[in-house]
Amino acid sequence: PNSRVLVHKAPVYPTTLTTLNGLNVTLIEADFNDLEDIRKVMQEQDVDGAIVQYTRQKPDDSYEMQAVIDTIKACKDIPIITDDNYAAMKVSKIGVELGADLSAFSAFKLLGPEGVGILLGKAELIDEVERNNYSGGSKVQGWQAMELLRMLVYAPVALAIQAEENERIVHALNDGRIPEIKDAFLANAQSKVLLVEFREDIAEAVLEE
């Protein structure tokens, strides 16, 4: 509470912003696409911690998680929390594996129950969350815990099959399976999205069908 937290100069994810507002946190902005701007802000401002969102907050974002985390830590050894939501199990390393102190994401992103958060990181931070977790409404219930454990086994397989099928569809479309499609490719808009370009201006007609 009442801390000064470094964030990317972009719209903060709504649920994250609600939590920060509830803690009366002061947001200090830096452009994570520009490492020099991070250094400048860290030198000029008294920062208590940082939140780095793994997936892009703006279409032109290009920052690398490792570089941002390393730059912040080099300026001042403050706690860094990464919001790994849509990147969990879809990237080679999540935030805590790149040097952050805590990774946070929703169990729903692993095909688990909604409203359950997952934290990975330093024991003292997780212990503090546990101490402050209100047992009357915030504790994970037994059925939720069991559902999440099942999804930890199922999700890696399901997401891997999904990624494989995405690639297969792209190759099939680019090989001319559907003559009306000129080009197809995958975009990472938090979740993977298949985009196609038609040879003619027929997109509206396709949507109407």
Regions flagged by a language model, labelled:
Residues P1-L159, A163-D183:
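Conserved PLP-enzyme active-site core in the AAT-like
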Residues N188-E209:
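Conserved C-terminal alpha-helix-loop-beta "cap" of PLP-dependent enzymes
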